[in-house]
UniProtKB/Swiss-Prot annotation:
Catalytic activity: 2-deoxy-alpha-D-ribose 1-phosphate = 2-deoxy-D-ribose 5-phosphate; alpha-D-ribose 1-phosphate = D-ribose 5-phosphate
UniProt function note: Isomerase that catalyzes the conversion of deoxy-ribose 1-phosphate (dRib-1-P) and ribose 1-phosphate (Rib-1-P) to deoxy-ribose 5-phosphate (dRib-5-P) and ribose 5-phosphate (Rib-5-P), respectively.
Pathway annotation: Carbohydrate degradation; 2-deoxy-D-ribose 1-phosphate degradation; D-glyceraldehyde 3-phosphate and acetaldehyde from 2-deoxy-alpha-D-ribose 1-phosphate: step 1/2
Species assigned in the record: Kosmotoga olearia (strain ATCC BAA-1733 / DSM 21960 / TBF 19.5.1)
E.C. no: 5.4.2.7
Annotated Mn(2+) 2 binding sites: 282, 287, 335
Gene Ontology MF term list: magnesium ion binding; manganese ion binding; phosphopentomutase activity
Protein name: Phosphopentomutase
Needed co-factor(s): Mn(2+)
Length: 389
């Protein structure tokens, strides 16, 4: 048997009860994107019950969903990739990761400059595409590294591939990760952001690389691997969990490459969890407030669903979800604190089952463990009995 999780990165379905605290009142990535473009065409997801989860123009509710559907609420404080993915696999944070609305303090920047031998420019919260436009010429002239953060807990380093070769940029990220770990600050990710081209038309390349904090405790993926259930990671999953509980991984260039590589695993592996993150929704469209691009990417994914379902074996179970929101229609370019969809399909999965509002994303990881007959973890409630006879 195989379980397949596909995370539509940032495809939230409406504000969490505490969204106002995060400045995200009214956010609804799916609903607002659909409205902004005059409706979404997602017939395959609609048949799985997507339209039953929130009002999505063009995706009406169905009286008979082909699988189980519900919403998941995030128990951890935060609204970022790491927090969401860790919670899927059983880690519920007590305190959010550290943020740097005024940039990073001297006790981080000074040793970083010293160890890399390069000056830092920027050191402020910024949109990645905007800051390379703003500081790219200075970076090209001086070789200084563009360091920036966002409303997430991230230390990002942008560099032109002709000024700083990618392997060198990765080395600088490892230096930053070490300094941050030793500093006592809890920073979720260090991210390499290489770009190419000429000012002002720079393009970020797919050679991005994330250096995550290791998970704070044992995650469901590790339980699986210890019990002989392999875990195959597609996209940035391996980076998010810092390699913990991952048997094999592949990187992806874009969403469609991610779907192709997921299909490769579905065709070739006999047992295990195939765990995919499709990042374009978030990276290319959510943060750039581009609802048209976001809508097109959602429709492109939906068009591939029959292929995914058609490749599955009778005892496989597919889970489609998201890790947070990133509403492209709000003035903010940051993530939004939202509920996430939960769509479950398989030939043996009961049809038209409403799974309700799950109290934590950890219900997903707990259900995966239950499906493979692995001992439960501390957090989360399995919904295996609700979806299988």
């Amino acid at each position: 048997m195989r379980a397949i999780i596909i995370v539509l990165d940032s495809a939230g379905i409406g504000e969490m009860p505490d969204a106002e605290k995060y400045g995200d009142k009214g956010s609804n990535t799916f609903g607002n994107t659909a409205k902004a473009v005059g409706g979404l065409h997602m017939p395959n997801s609609q048949r799985l019950g997507l339209g039953n989860l929130t009002d999505i123009l063009g995706v009406p509710p169905t009286d008979h969903a082909l699988g189980a559907y519900g919403r998941m609420l995030e128990k951890s404080p935060g609204k970022d990739t790491t927090t969401g993915h860790w919670e899927f696999m059983g880690i519920i944070l007590e305190k959010p990761f550290d943020m740097f609305p005024n940039g990073f303090p001297p006790e981080i920047i000074e040793p970083f400059e010293k160890e890399t031998g390069r000056k830092v420019i920027g050191n402020k919260p910024a949109s990645g595409t905007e800051i390379i436009k703003e500081l790219g010429r200075e970076h090209e002239k001086t070789g200084a590294l563009i360091v920036y953060t966002s409303a997430d807990s991230v230390f990002q380093i942008a560099a032109h591939e002709e000024i700083v070769p990618v392997p060198e940029l990765y080395k600088y990220c490892e230096i930053a990760r070490k300094i941050l770990n030793e500093s006592g600050y809890k920073v979720a990710r260090v991210i390499a952001r290489p770009f190419i081209g000429e000012w002002p038309n720079y393009t970020r390349t797919p050679r991005r690389h994330d250096y995550s904090l290791p998970p704070e405790g044992k995650i469901a993926l590790e339980y699986l691997v210890e019990n002989g259930v392999p875990v195959y990671a597609v996209g940035k999953i391996n980076d998010i969990y810092d390699g913990h509980g991952i048997t094999e991984y592949v990187k992806t260039k874009d969403n469609m490459d991610g779907v192709d590589k997921t299909l490769d695993y579905i065709r070739k592996v006999d047992k295990g969890l195939i765990f995919t993150n499709l990042v374009d929704f978030d990276m290319k469209y959510g943060h750039r407030n581009n609802p048209e691009g976001y809508a097109k990417a959602l429709e492109e994914f939906d068009a591939r669903l029959p292929e995914i379902i058609g490749t599955m074996r009778p005892d496989d179970v597919l889970f489609i979800t998201a890790d947070h929101g990133c509403d492209p229609t709000t003035p903010s370019t940051d993530h939004s604190r939202e509920k996430v969809p939960l769509l479950v399909y398989g030939r043996h999965v009961k049809e038209n089952v409403f799974l309700g509002e799950r109290e934590t994303f950890a219900d997903l990881g707990q259900t995966i463990l239950d499906l493979f007959g692995v001992e439960p973890m501390e957090n989360g409630t399995s919904f295996k009995k609700e979806i299988l006879d």
